[in-house]
């Protein structure tokens, strides 16, 4: 594989892998680690390298299905995939929305209702769901892969379907509706 398919230019993936399976302080010190980089999730130093996400899901699923049992124990070791990433969109201007069933216009209530994301210089970041990614995660779980997913770093409240904030949304100047408290792919709200 080209080095861009597994090189961590930002350091986040390496940091998380160290927590999970570092040789000195990791929780699973004897785990075997494989690094695969997702194309399109660039860190600040990344030259936009990596593999397409759909290919990665297929590779992990097939590898899990065909791997052999541990030679010492005779048991197939678990496959754990860490996905400490997520999808987001940016917005600059809000025209209105809905908070707990009450519609509003303008952007003054966004902050009051706790519906703003983290401003990163280019706009406010908002988590988004990607149905194809969520379906691929379901397939991994059904295949027996243990899936660990990021909770997020942007201080968004995540609500389940019975929470009064689950259907909160805002609309931006492009007419797009963004549900605020549903998390991002892969399944950060489940």
State each model region's role.
Residues 87-190:
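Substrate-binding/specificity loop regions of serine endopeptidase catalytic domains
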């Amino acid at each position: 594989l080209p080095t861009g398919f597994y090189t961590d230019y930002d350091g986040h993936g390496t940091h998380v892998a160290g927590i999970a399976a570092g040789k000195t302080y990791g929780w699973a010190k004897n785990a075997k680690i494989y690094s695969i980089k997702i194309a399109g999730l660039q860190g600040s130093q990344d030259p936009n390298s990596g593999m397409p996400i759909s290919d990665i899901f297929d590779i992990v699923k097939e590898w899990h299905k065909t791997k052999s049992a541990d030679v010492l124990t005779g048991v197939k070791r678990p496959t754990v995939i860490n996905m400490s990433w997520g999808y987001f969109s940016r917005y600059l201007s809000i025209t209105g929305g809905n908070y707990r069933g009450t519609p509003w216009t303008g952007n003054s209530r966004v902050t009051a209702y706790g519906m703003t994301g983290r401003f990163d210089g280019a706009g406010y970041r908002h988590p988004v769901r990607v149905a194809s990614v969520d379906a691929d995660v379901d397939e991994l779980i059904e295949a027996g892969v243990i899936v660990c997913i990021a909770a997020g770093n942007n201080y968004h409240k995540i609500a389940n379907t019975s929470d009064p904030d689950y259907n909160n949304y805002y609309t931006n100047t492009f007419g797009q509706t963004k549900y605020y408290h549903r998390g991002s792919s892969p399944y950060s709200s489940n």
